[in-house]
Structures are given as structure tokens and as C-alpha cells.
């Protein structure tokens, strides 16, 4: 059986949580492989609503192993809080069903402070739209080879040396920003406080996953955010600090690339974005407002209102290529119910010429204008549909046209936040 990687095919918030939860029924292990607690997702199971940010979605499913891989940056205090929150909802979290890579990078208080200060000090038009949770600064320390990693908490005798190495960078940086230096003792106290709460979950994740792979276990890799926020392939610099494309499932978990298997991209039937950056199909009118209101487009973690626009087939086709997507899960089709006409971006105009890809240049990205194809909407409802027969004819035409434009089949269709309201075309674990 193939393993499955789930990645966002837009700018995040595509509904990955529901799809991962749906797929986790057939998975043995669910792995988070990048990002941090900056990308929240909501799971609706029966009458219970779970809001997760760091824990893999499989944690709410009994009998599943959840894994946080080395590609994640981990805020240990947030982890403790999130475990406590879902435990209060009746979810059992123990070292038996949650494993964290021993070489995962930790987010510290100084990372959060630095992140918030930088974003607040940014001038208008340059703000990245960070969640101010320390994700970027933690990744900077990781690639700068000065990060504190989870395994370091298990070696307190050498911790001071590692903190000093970290502060050798942060002290002059903070002085330049007008911030007070952080005493070594404060960081040590922060780490000593949380160490006994998180160390029991530590494991050599790469070895554990390789053993599971050899034993024929089904592994589901859960991406955070979306491919258009990838630090290399996204709308740079308005991106996140990690690689969000499917290939990072291997690097961020410690497995080889052959372990990835089927790649499922998640895309809304329209487009949303949080924070700054280019958005060719963004709507500033009543239609955009209607999409946002009907889709409840507010961030799970931040509560920020999301920008809304029509489906951009050019961008999704691009992420199909850069992530090697085999099939798409199309979500929130029901939000388009009742629109008399629906537009889809099929190309761009750049300086008077038509182009069929999104340019890498920030200046060129700002100059493109969308070329739309207008389709007839539908008066019937798709909400709660669980088979093609329940969909209006025009809704089916819309889905089929999207498949043609993005050059990938729709494997799953989601028609509400409820897990059961899903139309299965291809099972990624079986087909």
C-alpha cells in the first residue's frame, strides 16, 4: 500500500485538517513534517470540534501513532498547552501515541519576541504577515547551526554551552534592534521548566518510521500551510520559513524520497490568503465579502480575516507540478452554492502579453492581471452531498473544468466540515 502525503495547493487554510482526519482512518501513523504552531486546523467529529496547531490530526483517533518530525520547529510550551486542551476534551495523549523527533528544533521565548518586534517594525507594504510565534527566527537558528534541539534538554551538563552559542548571535542582534539582552539563566530556566513535560515523547523518529515502512504500515504525512507559501516555490518574500511542497515530507521526517507515495493536494473551490503578498484573483467587492462570510474565513489561530477571490487555476496547476501532486481534494464547494456565475482564472496578462504561469519576480507578480473564464453557477445545493448524483449538473461541470485546467484529477470532494460529507473518487491509500 502507498503512503500518502497531504499538502495545501494554495496559500494554506484549504481544509487539510478534515481531509487528513478522513484519511487517518486508514493510516497507522500520521506525521507532521514541517512548520510549527502557526498553521491551525479545525477537525469536526460528530458534535466535537478540535482546534489543533502543532499536534498531528491523527492524535484525535484512538489507535493511531502521531509523529512530529525533525522538519518541524517546536514550541514546547505550546505543545504542553495544546496537549492539555485536547486532553480536557477527552483525547488521550501519551508517549505511546505521540512521538517527537529527538533532533527537532525548539522555539524559545526570544524567538517569539524577535518575530513580533520585526513584524511590528516593518513598514506598510513590506509586512510579511507573520503570526509572530517565532517560527521564522527558529528556522534561522536551525540553518545557522545554533539552535537548541529537543535532545539538548536531555543533556543538561552541556546546555549552557549551547545557550551561549545561541546568544552569541542574538545578543548583538537584539542590541541593534533596541532590545535588552536575554540572560543565559532565563533561557536555561525556561528549558528546565518544560524539559520533563516533553522529553518523554522524544524518539529517533527516522528509525521508527523506517521500521514501520518495512513492516508495511500505512504512513500519512501531514503538511502545514500551502505550497504557495513555500520558501523556494511560493510568493517570496511573502512566504513561510520552510519548504511546504511534498518533497519535504521525506526530509522533514527522516525517510528517503521513495517512501512518499501518493501526493494529495488540497484546494478550495475558490481562493483565500492571510496576510500580505500578491493575490491576482482577490475580490474587494461584495462577492469577496460573500465568499468570506459564507466560508467563515477567519484564521483558526489568529482570528484574522482571510482575503478571498476566485479559483486560480494557473497557481494550482503550478503547485501540481512543484509538489508532484497525483490528485486533488477539492474543498468548500458548497460555499459557491447560489452564485449566478462563477469565474476561474485561466491565465494572466503581464505587460500586455498573456502568460500561463505565475512569475517568480516580486515586481512582475504585482503587475499581473487575471484572465477569467466565466461559468454558469447553480441554484441547487451541494452542502452535505456524499455522491455525484446529489450534485447539481453545473457543479459537476465546474469540478470537471477545474480538473482540465489544473491537469490533475479530483480524488476527493468535500461538501461540508463534517468528515462524512465527502465524495470519494480515488482512495489515495488503495488506488
UniProtKB/Swiss-Prot annotation:
Q: Which residues bind GTP?
A: 12-18, 40-42, 306, 332-334, 414-416
Q: Which residues form a coiled coil?
A: none
Reactions mediated catalytically:
IMP + L-aspartate + GTP = N(6)-(1,2-dicarboxyethyl)-AMP + GDP + phosphate + 2 H(+)
* Class of this enzyme: ligase
Domain of life, per lineage: Bacteria
The record's keywords, sorted A to Z, are:
Cytoplasm, GTP-binding, Ligase, Magnesium, Metal-binding, Nucleotide-binding, Purine biosynthesis
Binding, Mg(2+): 13, 40
- Give the Enzyme Commission number: 6.3.4.4
Provide the active-site residues from the annotation.
Answer: 13, 41
Query: InterPro entries recorded for this chain?
Result: Adenylosuccin_syn_GTP-bd, Adenylosuccin_syn_Lys_AS, Adenylosuccinate_synth_dom1, Adenylosuccinate_synth_dom2, Adenylosuccinate_synth_dom3, Adenylosuccinate_synthetase, P-loop_NTPase
Residues annotated as binding substrate are: 300-306
Q: What does this protein do?
A: Plays an important role in the de novo pathway of purine nucleotide biosynthesis. Catalyzes the first committed step in the biosynthesis of AMP from IMP.
Protein name as it appears in the record: Adenylosuccinate synthetase
Origin organism is Methylocella silvestris (strain DSM 15510 / CIP 108128 / LMG 27833 / NCIMB 13906 / BL2)
Amino acid at each position: 500500500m502507498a503512503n500518502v502525503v497531504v499538502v495545501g495547493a494554495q496559500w494554506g487554510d484549504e481544509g487539510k485538517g478534515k481531509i487528513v482526519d478522513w484519511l487517518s482512518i486508514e493510516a497507522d501513523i500520521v506525521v507532521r513534517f514541517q512548520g510549527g504552531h502557526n498553521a491551525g486546523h479545525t477537525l469536526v467529529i460528530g458534535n466535537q470540534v478540535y482546534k489543533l496547531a502543532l499536534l498531528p490530526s491523527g492524535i484525535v483517533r484512538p489507535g493511531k501513532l502521531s509523529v512530529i518530525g525533525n522538519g518541524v520547529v517546536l514550541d514546547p510550551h505550546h505543545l504542553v498547552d495544546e496537549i492539555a486542551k485536547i486532553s480536557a476534551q477527552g483525547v488521550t495523549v501519551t508517549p505511546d501515541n505521540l512521538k517527537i523527533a529527538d533532533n527537532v528544533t525548539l522555539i524559545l521565548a526570544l524567538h517569539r519576541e524577535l518575530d513580533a518586534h520585526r513584524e511590528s517594525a516593518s513598514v506598510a507594504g513590506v509586512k510579511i504577515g507573520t503570526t509572530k510565534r517565532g517560527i521564522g527566527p527558529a528556522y534561522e537558528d536551525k540553518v545557522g547551526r545554533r539552535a537548541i534541539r529537543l535532545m539538548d534538554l536531555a543533556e543538561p551538563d552541556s546546555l549552557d554551552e549551547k545557550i551561549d552559542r545561541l546568544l552569541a548571535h542574538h545578543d548583538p542582534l537584539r542590541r541593534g534592534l533596541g532590545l535588552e539582552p536575554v540572560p543565559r539563566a532565563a533561557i536555561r530556566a525556561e528549558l528546565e521548566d518544560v524539559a520533563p513535560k516533553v522529553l518523554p515523547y522524544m524518539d529517533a523518529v527516522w528509525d521508527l518510521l523506517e521500521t514501520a515502512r518495512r513492516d508495511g504500515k500505512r504512513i500519512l504525512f501531514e503538511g502545514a500551510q500551502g505550497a504557495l507559501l513555500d520558501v523556494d516555490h511560493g510568493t517570496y518574500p511573502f512566504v513561510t520559513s520552510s519548504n511546504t511542497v511534498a518533497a519535504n515530507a521525506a526530509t522533514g521526517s527522516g525517510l528517503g524520497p521513495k517512501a512518499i507515495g501518493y501526493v494529495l493536494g488540497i484546494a478550495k473551490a475558490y481562493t483565500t490568503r492571510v496576510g500580505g503578498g500578491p493575490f491576482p484573483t482577490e475580490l474587494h467587492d461584495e462577492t469577496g465579502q460573500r465568499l468570506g462570510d459564507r466560508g467563515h474565513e477567519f484564521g483558526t489561530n489568529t482570528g484574522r480575516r482571510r482575503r478571498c477571490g476566485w479559483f486560480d487555476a494557473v497557481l494550482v496547476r503550478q503547485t501540481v507540478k512543484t509538489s508532484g501532486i497525483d490528485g486533488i481534494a477539492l474543498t468548500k464547494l458548497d460555499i459557491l452554492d447560489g452564485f449566478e456565475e462563477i469565474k476561474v482564472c485561466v491565465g494572466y496578462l503581464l505587460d500586455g502579453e498573456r502568460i500561463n504561469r505565475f512569475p517568480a519576480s516580486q515586481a512582475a507578480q504585482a503587475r499581473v492581471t487575471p484572465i477569467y473564464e466565466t461559468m454558469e453557477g447553480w441554484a441547487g445545493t451541494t452542502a452535505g452531498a456524499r455522491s455525484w448524483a446529489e450534485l447539481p449538473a453545473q457543479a459537476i461541470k465546474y469540478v470537471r473544468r477545474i480538473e482540465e485546467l489544473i491537469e490533475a484529477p479530483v480524488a476527493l470532494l468535500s461538501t461540508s466540515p463534517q468528515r462524512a460529507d465527502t465524495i470519494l473518487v480515488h482512495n489515495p491509500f488503495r488506488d
